[in-house]
Swiss-Prot record:
Pathway: Metabolic intermediate biosynthesis; chorismate biosynthesis; chorismate from D-erythrose 4-phosphate and phosphoenolpyruvate: step 4/7. Pfam families: SDH_C (PF18317), Shikimate_DH (PF01488), Shikimate_dh_N (PF08501). Belongs to the shikimate dehydrogenase family. The active site is at K66 (proton acceptor). It is an enzyme of class 1 (oxidoreductase). Involved in the biosynthesis of the chorismate, which leads to the biosynthesis of aromatic amino acids. Catalyzes the reversible NADPH linked reduction of 3-dehydroshikimate (DHSA) to yield shikimate (SA). NADP(+) binds at G127, A128, G129, G130, A131, N151, R152, T153, V154, D155, K156, I219, G242. GO terms for molecular function: NADP binding; shikimate 3-dehydrogenase (NADP+) activity. InterPro entries: Aminoacid_DH-like_N_sf, NAD(P)-bd_dom_sf, SDH_C, Shikimate_DH, Shikimate_DH-bd_N, Shikimate_DH_fam, Shikm_DH/Glu-tRNA_Rdtase. One of its GO terms (cellular component) is cytosol. The gene is aroE. Homodimer. This is Shikimate dehydrogenase (NADP(+)).
Length: 277
């Protein structure tokens, strides 16, 4: 019997997840299908109960449901609970179990381009929203000890740091102070929507004085190279856009559902082609 998987969100027509997962199923000769479900906020509970009743094997959760979905699940993974958001649900033994693969997916993506363990790195996070929170907690979870957070509103950065129970040395900074201190970091991670199409001329931080070998990663993938990445490249930095995070979080969800590890490079090249790269 064909296994059913999917993604719920609103809007959902733009999602690249069905193409990525269905190609992986086909490549691994698995009898499964991944479908995009448009689910409005007011019917989220009914939709989740319906998916469970249909016997869906697992599904992803995207905007605007990542927080609200938690009220309708049977169990929530401790890391997802700490992050306060779920983007992957596994249907196992009659229970819907929520996980967050956004942060862990990002960490795996970052590890793929780092020559040294992340635990030894001093990291600067730009932004203190939902994506930053997932990445901060996931970096802390793998043992990173130095993570500073820069945000337009410094109090929001302080709140994010205070919410983490792991032993992490963190300082909340203004974006202005972070700009001056950028040369102190091994890795800079841009987690805001600043620089996303169509406002491509914007950047949260002017890159001007990086240390040699700095990694600059941006979770945005439209455009492929944001202003901050272009500036970082000119400074000789190793750069990474948001495609890697998208692919790695999806691959981790796929692994959780099926027990099979998909071909990451195949997934990545497919997504790049679909985005017109």
């Amino acid at each position: 019997m064909k296994q059913l998987y999917g993604v719920i969100g609103n809007p959902i027509g733009h999602s690249l997840s069905p193409v990525m997962h269905n190609d992986a199923f086909e490549h691994l000769n698995m009898d499964a299908h991944y479908h995009a479900f448009l689910v409005k906020e007011e019917v989220l509970g009914e939709a989740v109960r319906g998916l469970k009743a249909l016997g869906i094997s697992g599904f992803n959760v995207t905007t605007p449901h990542k927080v609200a979905i938690m009220d309708y699940l049977d169990e929530i993974d401790p890391l997802a609970k700490q992050i306060g958001a779920v983007n992957t649900v596994v249907h196992k033994d009659g229970k819907l179990i929520g996980y967050n693969t956004d942060g862990i997916g990002f960490v795996r993506a970052l590890q793929s381009i780092s020559n040294e363990p992340l635990q030894e790195k001093r990291i600067l996070l730009l932004g203190a929203g939902g994506a930053s929170r997932a990445i901060y907690f996931s970096l802390a979870d793998v043992g990173v000890k130095e993570i500073d957070v820069a945000n337009r509103t410094v109090d929001k950065a302080k709140e994010l740091i205070a919410a983490c129970t792991a032993t992490v040395h963190s300082v909340a900074l203004s974006l202005e102070k972070a700009t001056k201190e950028q040369g102190n970091y091994d890795i800079i991670i841009q987690t805001t929507t600043i620089g996303m199409h169509p406002r491509v001329e914007h950047t949260p931080l002017q890159i001007s004085s990086l240390k040699k070998g700095t990694i600059v990663s941006d979770i945005i993938y439209n455009p492929f190279e944001t202003k901050i990445l272009c500036e970082a490249k000119e400074q000789g930095a190793i750069i990474q856009n948001g495609i890697d995070m998208f692919v790695y979080q999806g691959a981790l969800a796929f692994e959780m559902w099926t027990g099979c590890v998909p071909n990451i490079e195949r997934m990545k090249q497919l997504v790049i082609r679909k985005l017109g790269g």
